[in-house]
Structures are given as C-alpha cells and as structure tokens.
Amino acid sequence: MARTATIKRDTNETKIQIALSLDGGFLAVEESIFKKRKIDDDDEHAKQATSSQVINVQSGIGFLDHMLHALAKHAGWSLIVECIGDLHIDDHHTAEDVGITLGIAFKQALGQVKGVKRFGSGFAPLDEALSRAVVDLSNRPFAVVELGLKREKIGDLSCEMIPHVLESFAQGAHITMHVDCLRGFNDHHRAESAFKALAVAIREAISSNGTNDVPSTKGVLF
C-alpha cells in the first residue's frame, strides 16, 4: 500500500498544500496553489527530481525550504510543499503552520503504526557540527529540541523558529522526538545537521520490522 498523503490547510494566516510519499517515487499535486503566481528562479533552490525522489519545497522562506529539502532527501521521501503566508507580518505563522501541516501529512501517510520498527535514531555531521535525533512513533506528541543556536536569523528564518518548526512537526505527526546538536559553532551547520539527523531517525522508525504486528505491548498505537 502506498504511504502517501496530500493535505490542504487554509487559515487566515497561511494557505498550505503538502504532498508526501514516505517511500519516495513519483509525486504530484492535482492543482498548485501558485497557479496565478509567476514562478521565478529563486523558487527553484529547493527543487530536485530523480528517478527515486521528487522534492519541491516553496514555503516562502528560503532557509526553511533548505531544511525541509534536506529532511526529505535523507528520509527518502518525495515531498511537495506550497505555502502562501503572511510574511509581511513575520515568519512565525508560515514556519509554524508548515511544520504542523507536514506533521499531519506524515501521520496520514504512515497510517496505522504496524509492521514498522517504531523507534529510530540517527546522527549526522556537517563539518564541525554534529547532531543526534531519536524518534518514537508513539502517537504521543512531544518534542525536546536543543540546537544551541546563537544568531537571530539564518537568511529570513528566525533562529527561534527552527526548533519550533520541529516541535510543530512532532505535534502534527503525533510522534515523540528528541533532537540535539551536540557540538558546532556555525549555526547554519548546527541546524542542517539536526534536520539530517532527524531524517535518518525517521527513515529507520518507519522501515519494516519484518512482521505485521503493532510494535507495542498495548497492542495499539492510535
């Protein structure tokens, strides 16, 4: 069964469409929310298509696009993110709502937590930075994120929003996750290594455990 989902979420602050395939492969949306908007070259920086993955992230915030591109690439996903947000106010609503909606898409695409490992962990270095992530597909939304970022912003994304995006994803996905940057002095590297570590952990957690069982002593995870 294909583990895919397409979610549309409209509020007074953001209009979002996300399509996700947890196992990669071809992915498309029926109709883009950008149909009346001219696409320029700046929108192509987080776009990649191969025989195994389709990734196109257009949140309106360049560094957020970069992080979600890295997450999708190393998790093995195909991912399309479209967002029109109230960036004339600030980046908060856009970043938060994209995280929430991606989490909802993840939960829907995964379906019943059955026949998968449930737990996953990963480390990812980026030059001097090293991050660790541990994930539990628990249906218990909780996130501990410690990245130690010191800059006010990276590109147009506030550094305070970077852990909040991850927390919002965990809430929407109903998963427990711990993400820590263990060392590093470049905030770009610290953040990117964290998203890559999370990708490695998620990829393990959603992989087959060789059974058709629910991986819980409760017998259910919903």
Swiss-Prot record:
Keyword Amino-acid biosynthesis carried by entry: yes
MF terms (GO), sorted A to Z: imidazoleglycerol-phosphate dehydratase activity
Pfam families with a match to the protein in the record: IGPD
UniProt-listed NCBIfam families: PRK00951.2-4 (NF002114)
UniProt cross-references to InterPro entries, sorted A to Z: IGPD_sf, ImidazoleglycerolP_deHydtase, ImidazoleglycerP_deHydtase_CS, Ribosomal_Su5_D2-typ_SF
Name used for this protein in its record: Imidazoleglycerol-phosphate dehydratase
Example GO BP: L-histidine biosynthetic process
Reaction(s) the record says it catalyses: D-erythro-1-(imidazol-4-yl)glycerol 3-phosphate = 3-(imidazol-4-yl)-2-oxopropyl phosphate + H2O
Family in the record: Belongs to the imidazoleglycerol-phosphate dehydratase family.
UniProt keyword list: Amino-acid biosynthesis, Histidine biosynthesis, Lyase
HAMAP family assigned: HisB
Record gene name: HIS3
PANTHER family per UniProt: IMIDAZOLEGLYCEROL-PHOSPHATE DEHYDRATASE (PTHR23133:SF2), IMIDAZOLEGLYCEROL-PHOSPHATE DEHYDRATASE HIS7 (PTHR23133)
EC number(s) given by UniProt: 4.2.1.19
